[in-house]
Structure formats: C-alpha cells, structure tokens
Amino acid sequence: MNHEDHVRLLRGGISEPGGVWADLGSGGGAFTLALADLLGPGSTIYSVDQDRGALREQERSMSARFPDRAVTYLAADFTRPLELPPLDGIVMANSLHYQRDKEPVLRLVRGYLKPGGRLVLVEYNADRGNPWVP
C-alpha cells in the first residue's frame, strides 16, 4: 500500500479538515501521515503507539512531508487510560484486531470523543483476501 491508498481508506470517515484527532496504535505512521494529509494545516494529531522507535521514525517522516502539522507523539498503551483532550475523531488502523477483548477498549476509546466525534476503523477482512493482507 502507498500513501494514496491510506488516504483513500480514511477519506470517507473524515467529514472536514481541521480538528483534533488521534491515531491509536499508529505504528510506523502510514495512517498518521494520511490523517495529516486529509486534516490539513491547523489540525492537531495525537499519535499513540508503544514502540518509541516507530514514533521517532514517524516524526521524521511527518517533519519531511508535512512540516506544518501539529503532532504529539505519545509512547503509550492505548488500551489503558490516556491523557488526551476531547477528540473530533480517532483512527485505529490495523490495531484493534490485536486486542483479545475489544469491548472494554472500544468503551475507553469512545470516552475520548467529543459528542458527534468519529471513530474510523481500518481492519483486515479475514474472509476475503486483498493485495495488502499477508
């Protein structure tokens, strides 16, 4: 998958540019970059992942591609309470399927959203393969 594929997957879940969003389980940042592209300047993104090395690499990529975006990188476990402001939206791309018990995680995540906030899930379709699923 390339950047345009990531943008395409998120586009339908993002109704307008700007706002305060989080990418939970952001890994290497492919979807964080897509989110930055779609939200544009003036937005704020919280990128959360347990892998500090991945977050550092993500920060380098973001600075090179979107130097005017405000991104906060948090090395944390998104299944535990986080210090986040009320969010306009949350992206969880290929991170929820790692959670054995999804309901408590989704309840926690829902609590971060402002009224009317959006949760955008990107997950593998295990029933039908596609070019990007290993």
Regions found by a protein language model. Give the residues of each.
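Conserved alpha-helix/loop element of class I SAM-dependent methyltransferases that forms part
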Residues: 1-20, 34
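A short acidic, Gly/Pro-enriched loop at the edge of an enzyme's catalytic core
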Residues: 79-90
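A short SAM/SAH-binding and catalytic strip from SAM-dependent methyltransferases
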Residues: 88-102
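Class I SAM-dependent methyltransferase SAM/SAH-binding core
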Residues: 22, 27-80
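Conserved class I S-adenosyl-L-methionine
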Residues: 118-134
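Short glycine-centered segments of the SAM/dcSAM-binding site in methyltransferase folds
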Residues: 20, 44, 116-118
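A short glycine-rich, Lys/Arg-flanked "PGG" loop and its adjoining helix->strand segment in the class I
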Residues: 103-118
